[in-house]
Curated annotation (Swiss-Prot):
This is DELTA-actitoxin-Aeq1b. SUPFAM superfamilies: Cytolysin/lectin. The record marks R179 as: Interacts with the lipid membrane. Composed of a long N-terminal alpha-helix and a core region rich in beta-sheet structures. Before the pore formation, the alpha-helix binds the lipid membrane, partitions into the lipid-water interface and stabilizes the monomeric molecule on the membrane. Finally, it traverses the bilayer, thus forming the transmembrane pore. Its main location: secreted. PANTHER family: BRYOPORIN. Gene3D superfamilies: Cytolysin/lectin (2.60.270.20). The keyword Ubl conjugation does not apply. Residues 140-155 are annotated as: Trp-rich region, which is important for the binding to lipid membrane. It is found in: Secreted; Nematocyst; Target cell membrane. GO terms for molecular function: channel activity; toxin activity. Octamer or nonamer in membranes. Monomer in the soluble state.
Length: 214
């Protein structure tokens, strides 16, 4: 009988320790999930994409004169897969989030080249959509506001196409980009989609875009 009691006590202790460990793991996962919010490179719930989230992403870059936080909400009914980012100037230490399901939003950032260099942050990012087409987003934060302004653009290209210099030139010069003027703008993207976006006019800028079904 005493042996059975001892075995019972040992088993109870093991179960309690396992439950405690599982609870700790769950709590840590929850903390990781909370930390992932407002971190460049993360994928968050689309409904939680706000200016405040992007300002947090922007602030994390530190004291940099030219920088941008980008948030793109996927309400397209499709899954997006990252292709690449092309930087005309500037850089990012963050890798594009690989997979962005419907109902989620990606967070990304960019900054001017390091050091005392007179550059802004200008680039294009591309995502392959599950319908076989490509979502492309342009962002342009110049160094010299005496000559240039903030600009952004969004377009769906037929087929899969990586971001490059040619895509940048098309989106910046030829395809009616929007000025970063602290206002919302809308565009029919074709292929049953539409886009709505906002960019401010600051050298420390945010770009928020929502891609939805038309």
């Amino acid at each position: 009988m005493s042996r059975l009691i001892i075995v019972f006590i040992v088993v109870t202790m093991i179960c309690a320790a396992t439950a405690l460990s599982s609870k700790k793991s769950i709590n840590e996962d929850e903390k990781d999930e909370k930390r992932s919010v407002a971190v460049a490179g993360a994928v968050i719930e689309g409904a939680t994409l706000t200016f405040n989230v992007l300002q947090t992403v922007l602030k994390a870059l530190g004291d940099i004169s030219r920088k941008i936080a980008v948030g793109i909400d996927n309400e397209s009914g499709m899954t997006w897969t990252a292709m690449n980012t092309y930087f005309r100037s500037g850089t990012s230490d963050v890798i594009l989030p690989h997979t962005v399901p419907h109902g989620k939003a990606l967070l990304y950032n960019g900054q001017k080249d390091r050091g005392p260099v007179a550059t802004g942050v200008v680039g294009v990012l591309a995502y392959a959509m599950s319908d076989g087409n490509t979502l492309a987003v342009l962002f342009s934060i110049p160094f010299d506001y005496n000559l240039y302004s903030n600009w952004w653009n969004v377009k769906v290209y037929k087929g899969h196409r990586r971001a490059d210099q040619r895509m940048y030139e098309e989106l910046y010069y030829n395809l009616s980009p929007f000025r970063g003027d602290n206002g919302w703008h809308n565009r029919d993207l074709g292929y049953g989609l539409k886009g709505r976006g906002f960019m401010n006019s600051s050298g420390q800028s945010i770009l928020e875009i929502h891609v939805t079904k038309a």
